[in-house]
C-alpha cells in the first residue's frame, strides 16, 4: 500500500537565468503534518506551486498519490487555503459553500464544515463582500475542506486570527491528521511550526537545507544558553574572557550567556565566584536554528 501523499524527486526550477529551486528531493507520508519554512526568496512558494501543478519543474518530477499534480483525480483530493482570500460578491456564505461542494464527488456535509470551521449561523447568511477578516479566514478554511480532501495545503493559515482562534484551528488540523489527511503549511510564526508540525522542511537559496522534526532540527545546532539574574553592580569581565563564553546578552533583568558548552560555563560561574541566582539552561530556539542554517548555507555557496 502506498504510504506517500507527496513525492518530490530531483526537482529543479529555473526562471530565465535564476534558479529558484535547485535539485530537491523529499516525500511526505499520508497523515503527516509538514511545515515548509524559509526566508523570503528561499523557494517555498515555487515548491508549493509545483506541488499544486501551477508550475512545472524544469527538471525532475512531482507525484501526488502516485499521479501527476494536474491529474483530475488528484485535484479532487486536494484542498487549498491561500493567504489572500478572494470572495464571490453577491453570494451568501452558505451559497458559496454549496457551490463548491457541488464540484466534488464526495464533499463534506454542511454540518461537518460548520463544525470544523466554527462558522456561525450569522456567518452563513452574510454576503461575501460584507465579511470581516476573521469571517473570510473561516470561509477560506471551509472552502479548502469542502471536497473532503486527502491533502490540505495551507498558506499562512492563521494570519489575522486571535490566540483562541489559532488554538482551535490547530486542534482541528490535528484532528484531520488523525483521520489520515495530509497537511502541508507555511507560516512565519515559528512557534506555531514548532508546536503544530510533526516535520519541518527548511529552504534557503532554493535548497532544502534541513528536514526533520522540530527537535531534530534544533539539535543540529550546538548553541545553548545559560541565563541568570545578577547583582547590578557585579562585573562579568572575568567571565567574558573565557573562550567558552561566545556572547553575553543583557535582556530585561537577566544575563544570557550563549555557549556550546553549558557545563563549562556553569563551572566557570562558580569558579569565578559570580553571584548568580535563578540559573537556567536553555536549548536553542527554532529561530536560532534557522538563522544558523541559512547563514551556513550562504557560506557554503
Curated annotation (Swiss-Prot):
Q: Which Pfam families match?
A: ABC_tran
Which UniProt keywords are listed? ATP-binding, Nucleotide-binding, Translocase, Transport
Keyword Cell inner membrane found: no
Q: Which residues form the ABC transporter domain?
A: 6-230
InterPro entries per UniProt = AAA+_ATPase (IPR003593), ABC_transporter-like_ATP-bd (IPR003439), ABC_transporter-like_CS (IPR017871), ABC_transporter_ATP-binding (IPR050763), P-loop_NTPase (IPR027417)
SMART domains per the record? AAA (SM00382)
Give any GO molecular function from the UniProt entry: ATP binding
Q: What EC number(s) does its UniProt record assign?
A: 7.-.-.-
Answer yes or no on keyword Translocase. Answer: yes
At which positions is ATP bound? 38-45
Indicate the family of this protein: Belongs to the ABC transporter superfamily.
Q: This chain belongs to which protein, by name?
A: Uncharacterized ABC transporter ATP-binding protein YvfR
Q: Which organism is it from?
A: Bacillus subtilis (strain 168)
Point out the gene that encodes the protein.
Answer: yvfR
